[in-house]
Amino acid sequence: ILLKNGENMGIAYALNQILKYAYENDVKWFLTLDQDSVCSRNLINTYSKYIEIPGVAIITSCIKDRNYELEDSFRENEEYRFVTYCITSGALMNTEICERCGGWDNKLFIDNVDGDICINLKKRGYKVLSLHYNGLLHEVGHGKNVKFLWKKDIVYNHPAMRQYYMARNQIYVARKYPEEFSMYKQLKKELKKIWLVILFEENKWEKCKARIRGVKDGFRLDIKKENNK
């Protein structure tokens, strides 16, 4: 099935289209992938072993990025754990639960779309299950590991427009869920991101302007009302 739009409506809108199709066609679970992601051959078979765990809304796995090193937080013999957040790509979504929670927030367009729905699900008592299993080869921007203030960090080298949405949506989601986020800490994170751009990325001025504009618009954007199904 190919669902087409006449214009770019954003990732959140497209995910809601998939959710609507799955719900109307009695599809119990559906897998979401980015265009540049490669999933392991046994991903669905592996995920299917865990779909009966009560309250699980999303199943995800460990991710390997093409450009930089990600730390494995799992203990050696740990089979899985419940987490608060996962990226959209490589996530197996429970159709009924996602529909009940109102799906994705179209106002986000792109970036933090995944974080928003994870928080929404958590607030309603549902869980995100992460498997100790390398299920996805992925690429976030053109990332690389760097040292900032003597600590290991990552810069993603996203273009200015993407930087705008990243900053805007971080502030918007923090406003949407004030019980989950400290706005003071979010603004500190944004300041750090700007410093990382200045120190390690190209097109610094355009990207910094975009992030500052994103922060301002994040405070202006009207909050989506929750679906109380």
Predicted regions and their residues:
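Acidic donor-diphosphate engagement hotspot in glycosyltransferases and nucleotidyltransferases
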Residues: L15, N42-I44, V113
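A short, conserved alpha-helix in the catalytic core of glycosyltransferases
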Residues: I97, C101-G102, K107-V140
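Short beta-strand-to-loop acidic/aromatic patch adjacent to the donor-nucleotide binding site
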Residues: V27-D36
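Non-catalytic, C-terminal membrane-associated alpha-helical segments of glycosyltransferases
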Residues: R175-K229
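A recurrent flexible, glycine/aromatic-enriched loop bordering the glycosyltransferase active site
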Residues: E76-M93, V155-H158
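Conserved donor NDP-sugar-binding/catalytic core segment of glycosyltransferases
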Residues: R41-D72
